[in-house]
Amino acid sequence: MNKEVFEAFINGSLAVPGKFIKFEQIEWSKHPIFDGVELKHIITGKDTEGQFSYHLVRIAPGKAIKNHIHETQLETHEVIAGTGVCINDGVEIKYEVGVISIMPAKVPHEVMAGNDGLYLFAKFIPALC
């Protein structure tokens, strides 16, 4: 798998007025429900007064974020490395580098990583955390 884009972001930084954070300083957090899924909470609701949150997501090969909904958040995915499949409101979407997917609030969705894992940015409006 070509992880160049992922590596660029994992070694990247967040720069906003008054704040500069290297992504390497942000710890990976295990997903509280889904095994093999880890997140870096790049921007949280605390940073945006609850308006949005931004997360780097790493899904291990063959693992999944199983079917779920977000009652109040619109969610976007931007695939930056690896491959997989997203089922978005019953429609299968092939996930590969460059794909962007949008899940409106209350829409069931799930994401399964391929054999090489899956790396994406997930944004939530309003903030998930």
Summary of predicted features, one role per range:
Residues 1-51:
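A short, N-terminal "cap"/entry segment at the start of jelly-roll beta-barrel domains
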Residues 40-43, 53-70:
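Conserved short histidine dyad/triad with adjacent acidic residue
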Residues 47-50, 59-63, 83, 126-129:
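Short, charged/polar surface micro-motifs in flexible loops or helix N-caps
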Residues 56, 76, 102, 116-129:
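A short hydrophobic beta-strand segment most commonly corresponding to one strand
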Residues 61, 72-73, 91, 107-108, ...:
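A generic "binding-loop/recognition-motif" signal
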Residues 66-67, 86-87, 103, 109-115:
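Short beta-strand His + acidic residue motifs that chelate non-heme Fe in jelly-roll/DSBH
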Residues 72-75, 79-84:
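Glycine- and acidic-residue-biased ligand/ion/polar-headgroup-sensing regions
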Residues 90-105:
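Short acidic-glycine-tyrosine-enriched beta hairpin
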